[in-house]
Amino acid sequence: VAGLIATAAATTPYPKPAPAAQFPEFKLPDRQGNAWRAAREDWEGARRRVREDPDWAEWLRRERAEVERWRVRHQDRVEWLPGWSHDGVSPKDGSRLVWNDRIPREEVQFFSSPSDPEVEITPKLHAWWVVTFRGQHVEMMVRAARLHRLTGDEALADWVRGQLDFYADNFLRWEPQRPGHPARLFWQTLTEASNLVKFTEAVRLLGPASPPEQRAAWLRQFFLPEVRALNSTQQAIHNIAVWQRCAVAQVALLFGDNDLWREALDGRFGLRAQLAEGVTGDFLWQEQSLGYNSFVLRAVHSLALAAGLSGRAGELGPELALAHNLLLAPLVLRFPNGELPNPADSGRIGRAPAPDLFAEVYRVFPTPLGLEEAGRVRDWNTLLDPPALPPAAVRLPEVASRSLESSRMAVLRGGGWQVFFHYGQLTRTHSQAEALNYSVYWGERPLSRDPGTVGYGSPLHRGYYARALNHNVPLVDGEGQQGHARGELTSFAPDAVAAAQPAYRPGVRAARALALRDGALVDTTEIATAEGPRRLGLALHFQGRVRLPGSFRAAGEWAVGRPEEFGYWTEVTVREFTSEVRFEVDLGGGVRVPVAIGAPGRFRLWQGSSPDVPPRRRESLYLELVEPVASATFVTAFRPPAAAAR
């Protein structure tokens, strides 16, 4: 099995000097200087805590009740075909469907979303329900195995063994749902990997409660076929590959397969290569969605837990030192209200710090915040490996202007403004037509931000959210960036940044400069075409009420002859201007930001309602020159409110 992955020397395109020395104020090194730790399990201490501490006793009562309710109520079925977790979206607006454990068509006749109380249960949505159910079911197996280990309840061990037998006996009866994709229990190998981690943990927890011959059958009928599937795919640097290598490594630890362990770590696309080649010099995952920092961190954390309990965490020392920074790096990007920028295609706007995440990983990546948060939590982690008392609280790092050239991003901060500039991409995966996009905050108030995307299964994902019109970018004939490209950082200073995309589209060069000047934020955008006059323009989006001058007329012809994404705007009006338009954006609370857009000659300005984070919408502008031209420069100036708290 190990030999299914070819081994080769990894390269390191992103220099990462001294990972262990980064963010020192948030790390708690031990006597050997390691800021990561090997997880422990104290079962005797756990039994004492649930016996002597009333709060822990109550927690145990609730945990047993939840597991028992699930155990007597639910059984997976071979005839249930799995779907894609991203398919669980409303056909109305792409908002997430609400999952619960009621069986579709048997116990409930509709699904629902925040915007739609009755969503038809189609085969595709039923398959979405199955994939979530199956993941929950496997998680319940782990919880039941822990309860058995804690209390000695043999009925729980019998149930877990029975479930493992069910999956092993029937594994090959689940046919892969996509040609060329070997996942069986789930729709994709990513979900196969993240749940294989749970299966592995359930068997580990059973320990001697599962006879050797039964473990051998599980290995032969289930674990080895899963390993073969995971090792046959994702031969690349990718977030999914991280999960697959980490899952296989945990199977290797469970069954003592050292060759498999070595290959999962040291293979050409093993874990070491994934982190060396997939994490930028700014300690951001190269696919750029900031959510992938935590996603990759969780994969490494799952392996680190297993390795620590097996006495082998030290073999992962350099990788753990690097992964620790994935937790901390987003702190330097946060806006004053704690929100994070949203480059690429994350499904929601993140926050930093994320206390729940810091608490979740404290057993391997302790931080003052993580220990403090974990100290408030009662769960299996804090029962088995109680968090140490946190040291004195640490202040979050001050966000300052910063060039993140390794990640193709920059931050400007000054005079009440904070800007996040995303000028290029490093990989095709998860990229959007958003090169040269920027987000702007005035103090704690978002003026313009990237909403991310909806579930990948929604037509709005590729049809709107991934397209240029959804971003603050230059447009040519209504189209933005084609493909993906690193772009060129042409200059950076604490109060100004400039970058270009020489091949923004075939025959098109685009460039943008952002500057903090005399209290204002000034955006200068240039477009040049090599193939003659084109319709040149740009899009701008706002989180407040746009107060435009004069009378606009309804633009019934708005989407005619334009790319698909234009059809998602509603209530569109239009007016023609010459050289400049001035208006205000009302952010609420008496804060109104004056905005002026300058353009060469006559232009049309459309205003409309566009999709925001579902189910919300926002006010958006599209500017386009009346006459086609071969080049144009647009200057947008945002001035500070006359009297506003920062």
Task: Outline where the language-model segments fall.
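Bacterial N-terminal signal peptides
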Residues: 1-6
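Extracellular glycan-targeting catalytic surfaces
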Residues: 11-236, 242-249, 301, 343, ...
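CBM-like, beta-strand-rich accessory domains located in the C-terminal region of large
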Residues: 11-12, 16, 454-646
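Terminal accessory carbohydrate-recognition/targeting modules of carbohydrate-active enzymes
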Residues: 14-55, 406-409, 413-457, 462-468, ...
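Active-site-adjacent structural elements in folded domains
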Residues: 126-128, 182-186, 209-213, 226-236, ...
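Secondary-structure capping and boundary motifs in well-ordered enzyme cores
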Residues: 136, 188-195, 240, 267, ...
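Inter-helical turn/loop segments and adjacent helix faces that build the functional surface
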Residues: 151, 206-217, 255-258, 306-318
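Carbohydrate-active enzyme catalytic cores, enriched for enzymes
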Residues: 249, 284, 291-446, 627-628
